[in-house]
Amino acid sequence: MRLPMNTSLATLKPSGIRRINALAAQHPGCIALALGEPDFPTPDVISAEVTAALGRGDTHYPPNNGRPVLREALSAYMGDAGLTFSADEVILTDGATEALSATFMAMLNPGDEVIIPTPAFGLYESIVVANHAKAVFLDTEPAQFQIDEEALRACVTPATKAIVICSPNNPTGCILNAASLDAVARVAEQAGIYVVCDDVYNRLVYVDGYERFARRHPELREQTVIIESFSKPWAMTGWRLGWLAAATPVIAEIAKAHQYLVSSAVSFEMDAAARALTVDPTPMLNVYRARRERVLAALDAMGLDVVEPAGAFYAFPSIKQFGLTSEDFCIKAIKEANVALVPGNCFGTEGHIRLSYCVSDQDLDEGLSRLSTFISTL
């Protein structure tokens, strides 16, 4: 006899990105331009802190929210970026994923709604649905992946609890301009909703003029939650370290969810996390910038339209001209050209593919060559 399980989870599907990577793994020699993971090792000075921590037996329970000295460092780090949060308003988390999970667990009641501008990382919808709430999608493609205020207002209902924004964006690489940020602020203030800022790519920006929502709109501090991660800027994806910041009344509730989800982040990684904050990610950023230029030139040569990415390490070109669904296009590319990309439908936007350029230069060049050859056959 099969006993019932959580009906909300039953509606969720495994990650489409992981599904594509699993298919690619079945094809020897396949070049994967699919996973958003830096191809660099974690800087040695960061890793050395873990070795030292283990050597002195730093393997016991830490404070739930992270050691005070680390939270002070995170507070100062955010302050340097113009974001004012005290150490008591910061929680060290098991990656940005847990930060998002704890945030929505603390924030949502059954039947609440969260506005998700698409294309968007599929995790947002999954966490919202798992908390018995509803994801409401705002299509940003007509606005060149910016947020149109009228369209945003049309998504708001009495059940709306929050909007989640990601800038630079996964999968487009686009950054939200001032008009988009201001539109979110006006709607959030008037509707009385939270703004959850997924800022995990904020150190990976290639153009001038980038602004973060919380810095531009400090008047909404009580309604804003900031999610950050060590994974992208310092190549620490496997460490599972992130943090979040919010005003005291909000952080107090999120801290409860964090405590009962994971208790705490890993004790012997905390000194390494503090050290990471002092490491300049510019060398990696410069490599990504050069790869971005090669990707844009290659896509242009292939005749693929793309809204130029200003950050992160993705491009999101249109494939509408080929008359294939994004899923069919990507499966066909793996089977016929041995190159893996992510279908746009994984992010809620059909007719596009996500191309990740956080791979070695050799793999990137070969992958682009294979993609070009594949497109010429369609």
Model-derived features: where do they sit?
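Short beta-strand to alpha-helix junction loop
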Residues: 65-66
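Class I S-adenosyl-L-methionine
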Residues: 70-71
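A short acidic, glycine-rich active-site loop
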Residues: 57-61
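PLP-dependent class I/II
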Residues: 2-5, 10-11, 23-26, 31, ...
